[in-house]
A protein has these predicted regions:
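Aromatic-anchored transmembrane helix interface
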Residues: 111-121, 133-155, 171
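Alpha-helical transmembrane segments of multi-pass inner-membrane proteins
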Residues: 26, 67, 120-124, 145-150, ...
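Hydrophobic transmembrane alpha-helices and their immediate junctions
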Residues: 481-521
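A membrane-periplasm/extracellular boundary helix in multi-pass inner-membrane enzymes
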Residues: 72, 181, 187-190, 279, ...
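Transmembrane alpha-helices of multi-pass inner-membrane enzymes
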Residues: 59-69, 293-297, 493-494, 514-548
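Long extracytoplasmic/lumenal interhelical loops at the membrane interface
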Residues: 417-482
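A juxtamembrane structural motif centered on a specific transmembrane helix
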Residues: 2-22, 261, 500-513, 530, ...
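N-terminal signal-anchor transmembrane segment
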Residues: 3-4, 8-81, 122-129
């Protein structure tokens, strides 16, 4: 209550009308972590065109409802700011006098509020001339909903921090744990032969692809499930590596129960979540996680070195801790993937499964199958001559087997090592988009139009095969569709959102290093995919940066 009154006092001193969250909005914020993990299943298909599939998911429904609930309050605040600015301008025109610093400070929040919607207005204008008008309008609508929701959250996060902060973080950990458990269940059911329609596995996620399943949870693909796990992973690492300095703090108090179970969860939950991340075999999310953990490791080392009272054993312990965080779940998941391959429907063995996974994660640089083959090459060549006659007789015998027996023989998986073609397709799309973007100055400045990337690329490069092919890089997609102007606008919007948070939260705390590495991890993953529906969690989990 004191924080809320303090926030109101600060706002009144600035001449700013305050806002507040309704009970429904508070409940929706607490439900947000659970909604985000149902990013595709269940889905409501609306209609489909030659360029786009229009579907409604639970996160999109959450966003739409929250934005609608936020609209009346935001409309009232914007109208008030507009009146203040117009009144101040008319008063200045009548009695011109040098503006004082006090007046500047008084009108600053109103100008800031009015400018926060500059990016949604820009994309709306940009969508008018888009070749893919329907997709453009719907995309601009999603952007409007995101901006309105973020403004509402950032304007109120400080006064509700102690009320919903711990519960929000706890719910995020619970949601991540349940989703991870479902991923392992998906894998087990797939190995047991349960049809894909019942397991919700995508076509490219089943065991016949690599020999072991790489689950997608309730997401459309495994890479999006892996991306969703990043937030609970870094939150669990926060509670593992950073013990709350003030145990009486409502915000940073430990979400785990004060028992042996809580102690086990503190250490086991991060490892379980990271193991699930490896199980998805999403290179984009895994590489982003590795980079962010390395940055976190460097930060911890520098922080300990700066402490004069730091003991050497504590400093030397850090590499062991971070190595355990990264490699223990990796070894566990590799063993599980090998076991799934051994028990799965393909002819591959435990070693083949481990080799395939390592080859994928190393981009083909480490091929255990080739290394093992070279070490046994001499022995195999020596035995080949002695068993030549036996093989010939076996061939004659196999030719006499009936077709039913031949059909029952297990087949090898579709891929047994790093799929270079997958990476080449993504890189080729990026190259084609850049070459198309550079064809005219107008296109470089304003882009091809919101939502028109797939259609434009298909018209200029029919060999792509479908206008539904999109650029698998969010930054490049923004540059191609909205041009340099769009990039500048979105950077300005990000700055305005940060200033809005600082304005409404005068006693704001510095963002925790864990929030920063999470933001870094999210930023890196956007290099591997694009599309607002698949990236909603990146924008809607922004409050987490201020709750740590």
């Amino acid at each position: 209550m004191s924080k809320k009154s303090t926030n109101k006092t600060n706002s009144k001193s600035l001449g700013l009308v305050t806002s507040s969250l309704s009970k429904i909005q508070q409940i929706m914020l607490l439900c947000l972590p659970f909604c985000l993990f149902f990013s595709y299943h269940p889905v409501i298909p609306i209609f489909s065109t030659s360029t786009t599939n229009f579907e409604l998911s639970i996160p999109l429904l959450w966003l739409l409802i929250f934005a609608i609930l936020s609209l009346p309050e935001n409309f009232r605040l914007y109208i008030n700011s507009l009146r203040v600015v117009i009144k101040a301008k008319s008063h200045t025109n009548k009695t011109p006098r040098p503006s004082s610093r006090h007046k500047t400070d008084k009108f600053y929040p109103h100008f800031l509020r009015l400018f926060t919607l500059i990016y949604p207005f820009f994309v709306t204008i940009n969508s008018i001339g888009s070749p893919n008008f329907l997709r453009a309008i719907l995309t601009s609508g999603v952007i409007w909903c995101i901006c309105l929701s973020l403004l509402t959250i950032l304007q109120n996060i400080s006064q509700y921090k102690t009320q919903i902060g711990k519960s929000f973080n706890k719910n995020l950990l619970i949601a991540g744990t349940l989703a991870s458990a479902f991923c392992w269940l998906q894998s087990i059911l797939d190995i047991a032969g349960v049809p894909r329609e019942f397991t919700f596995l995508c076509k490219g996620c089943i065991s016949t692809v690599f020999g072991f399943p790489h689950p997608n949870g309730f997401a459309i693909e495994s890479q999006f499930m892996a991306n969703l796990l990043l937030a609970p992973i870094f939150l669990s690492l926060f509670y593992l590596l950073e013990r709350p300095k003030n145990h009486l703090s409502k915000l940073n108090s430990d979400p785990y129960p004060a028992s042996k179970l809580g102690h086990f969860l503190r250490f086991g939950l991060p490892l379980f979540l990271i193991a699930t991340l490896y199980l998805t075999l999403s290179r984009g999310a895994i590489f982003s996680f590795w980079v962010s953990v390395f940055v976190l490791f460097i930060y911890q080392i520098v922080k300990l070195i700066k402490q004069k009272s730091c003991r050497r054993e504590i400093l030397f312990r850090q590499p062991l801790i971070f190595s355990a965080v990264v490699f223990l779940p990796l070894f566990f998941t590799l063993s599980a993937q090998g076991l799934f391959t051994e028990l799965g429907p393909t002819s591959h063995t435990f070693f083949n499964g481990v080799s395939t996974s390592v080859s994928q994660l190393s981009l083909g640089c480490i091929d255990l199958a080739k290394v093992f083959h070279k070490t046994n090459e001499n022995n195999e060549s020596h035995e080949t001559h002695e068993t030549h006659e036996t093989h010939e007789s076996n061939k004659l015998h196999l030719s006499d087997l009936n077709t039913d027996a031949a059909a029952s023989v297990q087949k090898a998986p579709q891929f047994t090592s790093y799929i270079e073609e997958s990476t080449n397709i993504r890189l080729n799309l990026n190259r084609l988009a850049l070459s198309s973007w550079r064809t005219s100055l107008r296109r470089m400045l304003a882009g091809v139009g919101l939502g028109a990337a797939g259609l434009t690329l298909y018209q200029e490069f029919p060999e792509l095969g479908s206008p539904k092919e999109i650029i698998q890089n969010e930054y490049l997609a923004i540059l191609y569709e909205q041009g340099i102007c769009g990039v500048i606008m979105i950077i300005c919007a990000a700055i305005l959102f940060v200033l809005t948070y600082k304005l409404h939260n005068k006693n704001h705390e510095k963002i925790s290093i864990y929030g920063r590495v999470l933001a870094l991890s999210f930023a890196l993953t956007l290099c591997f995919f694009s599309g607002l529906p698949n990236a909603l969690h990146i924008y809607l989990l922004t409050p987490l940066l201020f709750l740590l």
